[in-house]
């Protein structure tokens, strides 16, 4: 597939037989490439400067025992060999992200809504939800708080940050007016 910009420069796109984007050739001749595994998951990508990124996925156990995060991204290795690691809980939800010596932990409620993101020192953000899954409030470790109100159609009607409140109204097309 090819497309031309307003100045007549062409960008080319190549796909494999399964419809995965495998390369982009830019007007300046530089190329980005991507490779996929047999499950169509991205496993490598190389940017136009030649920087390669490798993506690694959790594989199923050999004995059929469930593995947290099975089939999900487990690591991204950048061109400079820095790696980001991902762990998952028993529901397959992301539970931690680690880069260098830093780790961020994520927690969820029974409805699988994200309720907490914090680093190893406990610094982070908390979310509270109503029974419909709407965010009621967001509270940071620094004490900043945002609250949200909703109408019967679950549309946000007000957002309060500190002492400032922004009210929202909607037209018949669901656009904010």
Language-model features: where?
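Beta-strand elements of repeat-based all-beta scaffolds
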Residues: 1-5, 9-26, 30-47, 51-78, ...
């Amino acid at each position: 597939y090819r497309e031309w910009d307003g100045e007549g420069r062409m960008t080319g796109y190549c796909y494999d037989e399964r419809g995965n984007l495998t390369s982009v050739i830019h007007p300046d001749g530089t190329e980005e490439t991507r490779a996929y595994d047999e499950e169509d998951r991205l496993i490598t990508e190389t940017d136009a400067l030649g920087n390669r990124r490798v993506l690694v996925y959790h594989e199923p156990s050999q004995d059929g025992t469930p593995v947290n995060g099975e089939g999900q991204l487990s690591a991204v290795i950048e061109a400079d060999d820095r790696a980001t690691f991902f762990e998952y809980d028993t529901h397959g939800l992301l539970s931690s992200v680690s880069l260098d010596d830093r780790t961020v932990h994520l927690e969820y409620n029974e409805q699988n809504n994200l309720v907490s993101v914090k680093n190893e020192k406990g610094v982070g953000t908390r979310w509270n939800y109503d029974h419909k899954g709407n965010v009621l409030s967001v509270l940071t470790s620094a004490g900043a708080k945002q609250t949200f109100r909703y109408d019967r159609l679950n549309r946000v009607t007000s957002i309060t940050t500190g002492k400032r409140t922004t009210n929202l109204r909607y037209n018949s097309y669901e656009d904010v007016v």
